[in-house]
Swiss-Prot record:
The lineage of its organism: Eukaryota, Metazoa, Cnidaria, Anthozoa, Hexacorallia. Belongs to the venom Kunitz-type family. Sea anemone type 2 potassium channel toxin subfamily. One of its GO terms (cellular component) is nematocyst. The record marks R37, G38 as: Reactive bond for trypsin. It comes from Stichodactyla haddoni (Saddle carpet anemone). This is KappaPI-stichotoxin-Shd2a. Its main location: secreted. It is found in: Secreted; Nematocyst. InterPro entries: Kunitz_BPTI, Kunitz_BPTI_sf, Prtase_inh_Kunz-CS, TFPI/VKTCI-like. Residues 27-77 form the BPTI/Kunitz inhibitor domain. Gene3D superfamilies: Pancreatic trypsin inhibitor Kunitz domain (4.10.410.10). SUPFAM superfamilies: BPTI-like.
Length: 81
């Protein structure tokens, strides 16, 4: 029984450690959408709501919080529990 309790505690600590893992700094950048002539649907991570959202990228400037797909945004910025 003591071994089972120890393993459960160990699993809990491992889960908490993974859940508090920090996301990359780029995920905290505000979307930078300069006025350019392109029209490219992209995704950025919105830390205020904790999810990836779509925006229109004009094709120039910007920052690294700019993902080609929703999946790429999630894979980079959303830490699984």
């Amino acid at each position: 029984m003591a071994k089972l309790y120890f393993l459960l505690c160990l699993a809990l600590v491992a889960c908490l450690t993974m859940a508090t893992e920090e996301m990359p700094a780029l995920c905290h950048l505000q979307p930078d959408v300069p006025k350019c002539r392109g029209y490219f649907p992209r995704y950025y991570y919105n830390p205020e709501v904790g999810k990836c959202e779509q925006f229109i990228y004009g094709g120039c400037g910007g920052n690294k919080n700019n993902f080609v797909s929703f999946e790429a945004c999630r894979a980079t910025c959303i830490i699984p529990l």
